[in-house]
């Protein structure tokens, strides 16, 4: 019923002039997402580009100035489960927490307080069982939270939307809190200028060539 009641959702969403706080240290960013697989998030500080996380129809990538060695890691989508990519650097996960994807192919659902909990059973990149839960706010008719639990039912990472923009009768994220429990890392997204169904520049989906590239398949540090 939730999916049928939703307004017609956009094929793309973009945010400009965002502030990203990582353990209270802030950077600026722009985020663009065009279904099904085009994604780009570039974060900058006064020292220049800090992170570049992206995806196109064929491959995904991430680069961080703070990682040593500072490679641009990439792989094809079909090999995602064969890589050691951690959740916070996974464009697929970031697309999900923006809240404009259809909710489908889930294993079960139930109501929890004012939320509809949608449950997915999956395996991570190490072939360990994980459980993904999305909480849908039935009053606002939109995504509230996204949670991943390990095989011991311990919460690994969560993303909760605490404030929304109302655009074209649809609630989209304005503020997202991400808690990566494994690394004791808290990230806050304060999302700025939002646009739905905007024609996004195709150059956004091109992997940058100005960094040394390493395929995640077979890579070990």
Regions found by a protein language model. Give the residues of each.
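Extended beta-sheet lipid-handling architectures
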Residues: 13-17, 26, 43, 55-57, ...
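Gly/Pro-enriched, hydrophobic low-complexity segments
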Residues: 110-214
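Short, surface-exposed charged micro-motifs
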Residues: 30-32, 50-52, 133-135, 163
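An acidic-aromatic
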Residues: 37-92
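Edge/loop elements at the starts and ends of beta-strands within beta-rich repeat scaffolds
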Residues: 5-13, 24-25, 32-37, 139-141, ...
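N-terminal leader/targeting segments and the immediate start of mature chains
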Residues: 1-24, 88, 212-221
């Amino acid at each position: 019923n939730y999916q049928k009641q939703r307004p017609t959702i956009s094929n793309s969403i973009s945010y400009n002039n965002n502030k990203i706080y990582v353990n209270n240290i802030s950077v600026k960013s722009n985020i663009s997402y065009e279904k099904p697989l085009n994604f780009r998030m570039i974060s900058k500080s006064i020292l220049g580009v800090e992170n570049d996380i992206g995806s196109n129809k064929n491959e995904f990538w991430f680069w961080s100035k703070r990682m040593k060695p500072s490679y641009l890691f990439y792989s094809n989508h079909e090999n995602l489960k064969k890589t050691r990519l951690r959740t916070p650097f996974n464009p697929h996960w970031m697309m999900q927490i923006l809240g404009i994807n259809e909710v489908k192919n889930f294993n079960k659902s139930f109501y929890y307080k004012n939320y509809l909990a949608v449950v997915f059973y999956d395996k991570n990149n190490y072939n360990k069982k994980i459980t993904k839960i999305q909480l849908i706010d039935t009053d606002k008719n939109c995504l509230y939270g996204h949670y991943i639990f390990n095989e011991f039912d311990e919460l690994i990472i969560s993303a909760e939307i605490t404030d929304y923009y109302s655009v074209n009768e649809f609630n989209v994220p304005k503020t997202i809190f991400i808690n990566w429990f494994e690394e004791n890392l808290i990230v806050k997204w304060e999302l700025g200028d939002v646009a739905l169904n905007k024609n996004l520049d195709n150059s956004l989906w091109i992997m940058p060539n100005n960094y040394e590239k390493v395929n995640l398949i077979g890579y070990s540090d």
